């Protein structure tokens, strides 16, 4: 085994004011001043144009020097055996071999210990347990560090991936989402507060609700929260907890809200791997409703590089949206997959749409790109899909055990 393993039970006026903000921009506008500027601009009008003007003015005025670079030596990664978490762990081990990671994961249906195979022992301690277990979480900062202090430095940051995330499941039973996404986040925040640990919270663009299909607007850090379903509501609640612990307790926090990810290790219940594995398993792909809903796709590797950038260079107390300008509607994505896998463009079945399904997500990542210098590397979506298809084709033993049960669950739901 390639790591330590611990088992636990575990308009006009707006235009003039925006110009004034541009002309008076300084190199040191603090967050409170930024917030005041936002409010003055937005209060002048209820229109989306006012909000866009506020965004632009604050981006121009916000030239405050970033925090000194943060160089963590030991990170607690919650949910590190899941889809995005595992990709993050692999990426950190590959690109920052001096960093040790303690992965805390409950190994629910969507997480697998084998997702971390190949991570060097020097980089990884695996703990099987639940983030809602406050005693276990506390032991990671006391007992674990005491036992391994000679070899592993103390935990200096938490990167919090652990979450229930599948919308369909939240519609059937929201309780695991409230427990993990809200209570679990609270437990981790309290541990971080007690030990003065930096805390990066992984969230979703779904907290902002959805956008109309025919409008050019995208989500920004100033977009209002309008969650549409139980999953996004639970993530919105967790975001607010993180902000409250920063303001009330002075906890060093950052938040990232990302668009839809694709890539290796994603469970077959998700849209892209479901279509790919259906074709590989000889099942006709399934498309919710007419397939006109738009998602903003990003490679999971790009998402993980953005997280590292925010963790190490982001300003404390700030939120950063992560996206790669990858807007496609679902039917076009499915037809890309069909083409790449040598199938007819109409070789799929329409099934019942998801109740309350969101129309469109779209991320404006300007703040992350201009303030921290991050940019996506994998911008050819079709090329990324081809690589993802290759991964699932080569890892049938990884996904096949989950396939039949997942499709049966969808069949019962009419999907």
Language-model features: where?
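The catalytic Tyr-centered alpha-helix of NAD(P)H-dependent dehydrogenases
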Residues: 227-234, 264, 268-272, 296-300
């Amino acid at each position: 085994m390639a790591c330590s393993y611990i088992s636990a039970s575990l308009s006009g006026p707006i235009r003039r004011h925006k110009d004034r903000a541009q002309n008076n921009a300084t190199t040191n506008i603090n967050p409170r001043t930024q917030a005041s500027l936002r409010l003055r601009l937005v209060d002048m009008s209820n229109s989306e144009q006012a909000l866009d003007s506020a965004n632009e003015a604050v981006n121009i005025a916000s030239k405050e020097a970033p925090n000194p670079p943060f160089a963590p030596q030991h990170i607690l990664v919650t949910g590190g055996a899941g889809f995005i978490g595992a990709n993050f762990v692999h990426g950190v081990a590959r690109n920052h071999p001096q960093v040790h990671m303690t992965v805390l994961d409950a190994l629910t249906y969507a997480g697998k210990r084998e997702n971390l195979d190949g991570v060097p022992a020097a980089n990884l301690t695996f703990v099987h347990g639940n983030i809602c277990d406050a005693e276990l979480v506390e032991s990671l900062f006391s007992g674990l560090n005491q036992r391994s202090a000679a070899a592993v430095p103390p935990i200096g940051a938490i990167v919090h991936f652990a979450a229930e995330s599948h919308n369909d499941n939240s519609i059937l039973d929201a309780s695991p989402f409230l427990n993990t996404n809200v209570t679990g986040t609270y437990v981790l925040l309290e541990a971080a507060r007690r030990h003065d640990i930096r805390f990066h919270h992984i969230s979703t663009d779904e907290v902002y609700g959805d956008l109309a299909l025919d409008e050019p607007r995208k989500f920004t850090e100033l977009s209002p929260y309008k969650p549409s379903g139980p999953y996004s509501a639970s993530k919105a609640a967790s975001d607010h907890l993180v902000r409250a612990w920063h303001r009330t307790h002075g906890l060093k926090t950052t938040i990232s809200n990302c668009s839809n990810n694709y890539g290796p290790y994603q469970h077959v219940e998700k849209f892209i791997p479901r279509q790919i594995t259906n074709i590989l398993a000889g099942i006709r792909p399934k498309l919710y409703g007419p397939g006109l809903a738009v998602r903003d796709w990003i490679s999971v590797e790009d998402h993980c590089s953005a997280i590292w950038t925010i963790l190490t260079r982001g300003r404390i107390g700030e939120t950063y949206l992560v996206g790669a300008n990858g807007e496609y509607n679902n039917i076009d994505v499915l037809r890309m997959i069909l083409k790449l896998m040598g199938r007819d463009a109409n070789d799929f079945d329409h099934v019942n749409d998801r109740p309350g399904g969101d129309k469109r997500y779209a991320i404006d990542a300007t703040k992350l790109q201009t303030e921290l210098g991050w940019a996506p590397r994998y911008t050819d979506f079709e090329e990324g899909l081809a690589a993802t298809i290759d991964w699932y084709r080569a890892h049938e033993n990884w996904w096949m055990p989950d396939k039949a049960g997942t499709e049966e669950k969808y069949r019962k739901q009419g999907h």
